[in-house]
Design a protein with these regions (language model features):
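A short acidic, often aromatic-flanked loop/helix-cap motif at beta-alpha or helix-coil junctions
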Residues: 42, 57-63
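Short glycine-/acidic-enriched loop or helix-start segments at secondary-structure transitions
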Residues: 15-17, 44, 97-101
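N-terminal subdomain of nucleotide-sugar transferases
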Residues: 1-41, 48-53, 83
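An amphipathic, basic-hydrophobic alpha-helix
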Residues: 61-87, 95-105
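Short secondary-structure boundary/capping segments
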Residues: 41-44, 105
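Short helix-capping segments at alpha-helix termini
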Residues: 27, 105-106
Length: 106
C-alpha cells in the first residue's frame, strides 16, 4: 500500500511515534511518504520504501508563525499525484487534518 504520513519533525512525542510507524510500515513492504517542514530527528536514511518530502514554508514578517496549513495541503496534493498515495495518516488534527481536507477539496 502507498501511505502518506504527515507529522511534526520533533524529536519527542508525536514526531517519534509517526517516524517509527513510518519506518515499521516501510519494513513491512509498504511504500511510505513522510511529509513535514523539516526532516524528523529520528528518521534514518537508506530505508527502502521510505521517502521524505519536505514542505516548503515561506516566512512572512506579517505572521508570527509561517502559514503551514496551505503549504502542507499543496504538498500533500503534489505527493498524492506523484506517488499515487492510497491514503494519508495525519498525526495531528490541527493543522494536519485541516490541510488534508483542503488537499482533498483542491
Amino acid at each position: 500500500m502507498r501511505i502518506g504520513i504527515v507529522c511534526y519533525p520533533t524529536v519527542g512525542g508525536s514526531g517519534v511515534v509517526a517516524t517509527e510507524m513510518a519506518m515499521a510500515l516501510a519494513a513491512r513492504g509498504h511504500d511510505i511518504h513522510l511529509l513535514s517542514y523539516d526532516r524528523p530527528g529520528r528518521l534514518r536514511g537508506g530505508i527502502p520504501g521510505l521517502r521524505f518530502h519536505e514542505v516548503a514554508v515561506t516566512a512572512y514578517p506579517l505572521f508570527r508563525y509561517p502559514p503551514y496549513d496551505l503549504a502542507l495541503a499543496t504538498r500533500m496534493l503534489e505527493v498524492r499525484e506523484e506517488a499515487k498515495v492510497d491514503l494519508f495518516h495525519v498525526h495531528y488534527a490541527i493543522p494536519h487534518a485541516v490541510s488534508a481536507f483542503l488537499a482533498r477539496s483542491m
